[in-house]
Every structure is written in structure tokens, then in C-alpha cells.
Amino acid sequence: KKIENIFYSKTGIKLFHGTLNIELETPYELENYWIIGKDEYGGTQDVYVQECKVLKQKAYIVRSEKTAHKSNVIEIVSDINFRENFNLKDEDYISVKI
């Protein structure tokens, strides 16, 4: 819960509980990111956060220090449920503006 409170204080949005993982055609390294430190939320890894747009909606890429995902997969958080709101299914193609 604490990470959601930190996110709210930094962005003003209340996160939907859950993430949307997007596989990109090429690897992606975060740019212009900010960090939620492990000490801030009581975790074991820093979390890197970069703003983006998914289907024209404001969202954030989150990546932990030691992510289990390949570098061409980005994990998205937002205040909306993309799967429900846009009827998304696995393997769908969507637009992401980074």
C-alpha cells in the first residue's frame, strides 16, 4: 500500500491495482525517470518511474532495480484498468508514446 501512497503524493493519481505488461519490438532503457527509493516504501529494490502515454492515456512505466522482465518489456501503471476500459487481450497491438 505504501508505494501507492508515494505514487499519489508525487503524481496526484490513485493507481489501479495491477499492471499492464507491454512487449516492445526492441529493448528500451528508461530516460527522464525518477526513483522511488527502497527506503521510501520499505522494499528491497529501488523502483524507476517514467511518464508515458498508453492509448493516449497518461500512464507510467515502472521498472525495479532487478526486473525479471526482458529489456523489451515495459510494465505500465495508471489510474485506469487498460484491459477493461479498452477491451485488451493478450497479444493485442497498442500505441505507447514514450
Language-model features: where?
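Long, compositionally biased stretches
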Residues: 1-71, 90-97
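Core nucleotidyl-transferase/polymerase catalytic module
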Residues: 75
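Short alpha-helix capping/helix-loop boundary micro-motifs
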Residues: 78-85
